[in-house]
């Protein structure tokens, strides 16, 4: 079997073990209610992580996504409650703004050859600051469409349901899979992350691809902000603090190499679900502090980073043997 599948197989094994343990310990864990809640509660994180997957596949990082979610929420609240705009129009404007800001960071990263870490860190601070310029307090988004979005449900067998947030997240994952594996852009992202110099020699448009990667990340984090705002029917400048780290964790647990060039969008989906399952198991237990979620996710990250290192060493050894 190709070694590039090892990380995602490890991800699936961890997910199966955790879910199996949950069903063994708590009979209610097998109810579709839990599955529906997992998909809904982690929808905005997984949408963000899909965009982060493309960034990490290209060999970059985007620390601005959490601040983008908060900014989009505050922007939408201002457009809907302050200017009387329909939420769908506000969402469209927000998506354009998010993609444009991502493109702006991508241009700086690509054209000036600056480390993505420092540029997206600047973007993180900038967007969070702008949130407080717009509004200092939590703002409710009171509109019939938002209420309808929050209340929309598709019944699953048993007691479970799929909400609008979960359905949008699943559509985003499918779209991400198509872009990553069935488009020239997706193949270019993998090539750049695998070996940027070789990609340039092959004539791949490295600069424009990187710009599009950060545009895509900005779009997906803006979409996550829209979903989060609709789901909570409110906006707050301090929303989604630390989500950028959770998104990176979901991508890594999902089997994408931090060095770039190897990974799967579906793996990111499973990584996000694993993080949700851990939170749910701790909630079901009742005797454990919520900080155990961070401890378990940290332990998983240690394991997956070591696995990634072993795989990259194996590939390096095969390349050396081939030469």
Predicted segment positions?
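Single transmembrane alpha-helix segments in multi-pass membrane proteins
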Residues: 18-25, 31-83, 107-114, 251, ...
């Amino acid at each position: 079997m190709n070694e590039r599948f090892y990380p995602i197989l490890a991800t699936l094994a961890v997910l199966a073990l955790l879910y199996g343990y949950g069903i063994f310990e708590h009979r209610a864990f097998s109810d579709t209610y839990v599955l529906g809640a997992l998909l809904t509660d982690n929808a905005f994180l997984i949408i963000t992580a899909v965009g982060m997957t493309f960034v990490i596949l290209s060999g970059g990082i985007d620390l601005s996504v959490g601040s983008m979610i908060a900014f989009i929420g505050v922007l939408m609240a201002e457009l809907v409650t302050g200017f009387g705009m329909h939420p769908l129009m506000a969402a469209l404007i927000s998506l354009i703004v998010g993609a444009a800001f991502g493109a702006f960071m991508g241009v700086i990263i690509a054209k000036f050859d600056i480390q993505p870490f420092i540029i997206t860190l600047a973007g993180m601070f900038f967007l969070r600051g702008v949130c407080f310029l717009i509004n200092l307090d939590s703002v409710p988004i009171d509109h019939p469409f938002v209420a309808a979005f929050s209340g929309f449900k598709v019944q699953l067998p048993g007691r479970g349901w799929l909400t609008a947030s979960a359905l949008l997240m699943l559509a985003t994952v499918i779209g991400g899979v198509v872009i990553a594996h069935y488009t020239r852009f997706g193949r270019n992202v993998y090539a750049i992350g695998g070996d940027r110099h070789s990609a340039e020699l092959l004539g791949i448009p490295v600069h424009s691809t990187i710009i599009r990667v950060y545009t895509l990340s900005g779009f997906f984090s803006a979409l996550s902000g829209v979903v989060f705002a609709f789901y909570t029917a409110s906006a707050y400048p301090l929303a989604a603090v630390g989500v950028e780290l959770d998104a990176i964790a979901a991508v890594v647990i999902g089997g994408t190499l931090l060095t770039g060039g190897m990974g799967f969008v579906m793996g990111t989906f499973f990584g996000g679900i694993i993080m949700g399952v851990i939170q749910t198991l701790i909630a079901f237990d009742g005797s454990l502090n919520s900080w155990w979620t961070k401890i378990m996710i940290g332990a998983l990250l240690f394991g997956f980073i070591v696995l990634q290192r072993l795989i990259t060493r194996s590939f390096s050894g095969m390349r050396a043997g081939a030469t």
